[in-house]
Regions:
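Short, solvent-exposed, charged loop/turn and helix-capping segments
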Residues: 1-2, 112-136, 148-155
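Amphipathic, well-ordered alpha-helical segments in soluble domains
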Residues: 75-82, 108-115, 142
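C-terminal amphipathic alpha-helix
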Residues: 3-102, 156-230
């Protein structure tokens, strides 16, 4: 599972690198265009206004903003994707996969926090940095609190199902008092824990939705604040 997360991250990184190369090529062509315009203007004594290189200025500014944004997006993407794989493991009740992806999520959350320590925000705008930090804090909390809770409940439920199967396979008159008492105790324990489990799941679902939505909105606002769309 961790290998899948790494491959997806590498694919996203490769896509972004390709996009950046395309933008770089466009910048080169815009620079050439501006240079040729100046040569032509000088040759024929044509006055070129300041706005002739406006496209080049906008492209340069856009690239600076997107380059800064991309660094934070890659940090966000890595934990967001790993989190989605973890949630699928939880949904399928795969304890081994839950543990593996939980470990990976904690690792990527810590790595992201370290990257943020040396990250240089664009124009000292900390909005997206803080939104990314909030996401990393949440995913680490998922790894350290949600996953153990899910594993604990899954193991308890598995124990209950095995005990129920054993009891169902026995005739009522062949069940010992100790077996009945132990099974009833297990039933009470499951009934108690299922409520706590559902509360935990619901809380993390709400927090996850709010955290991701906050990152997306902050991301859109960050780009809109600095990219010249006109």
């Amino acid at each position: 599972m961790q290998e899948v997360a790494e491959q997806s991250y590498d694919a996203m990184e490769a896509y972004i690198m390709t996009r950046d190369l395309v933008n770089e090529k466009i910048n080169e062509e815009v620079t050439k265009l501006n240079a040729n315009q100046k040569i032509f203007a000088n040759k024929y004594n044509i006055q070129i206004g300041e706005d002739t290189s406006e496209l080049g200025k906008k492209m340069k500014l856009s690239n600076e903003v997107f380059e800064n944004h991309t660094q934070l997006y890659l940090i966000f993407f890595k934990v967001n994707f790993t989190e989605s794989v973890l949630l699928k493991a939880i949904e399928s009740n795969d304890i081994s996969a839950i543990q593996q992806n939980s470990n990976a999520l904690e690792q990527y959350s810590n790595e992201g926090m370290e990257k943020l320590k040396t990250f240089q925000p664009y124009k000292n705008d900390m909005s997206l940095v803080l939104a990314t930090k909030k996401m990393l804090e949440f995913t680490k909390k998922e790894a350290l609190e949600l996953s153990p809770s899910v594993i604990s409940f899954s193991m308890l439920n598995q124990k209950f199902q095995e005990s129920k199967k054993t009891m169902d396979n026995k005739a009522a008159n062949s069940r010992s008092k100790e077996e009945i008492d132990n099974f009833n105790k297990l039933v009470n324990e499951v009934n108690k824990e299922v409520g706590n489990y559902n509360k935990t799941i619901n809380k993390f679902n709400i927090d996850r939705s709010n955290t991701i939505n906050n990152w997306n909105v902050t991301s859109e606002n960050f780009i809109a604040r600095y990219i010249p769309f006109e």
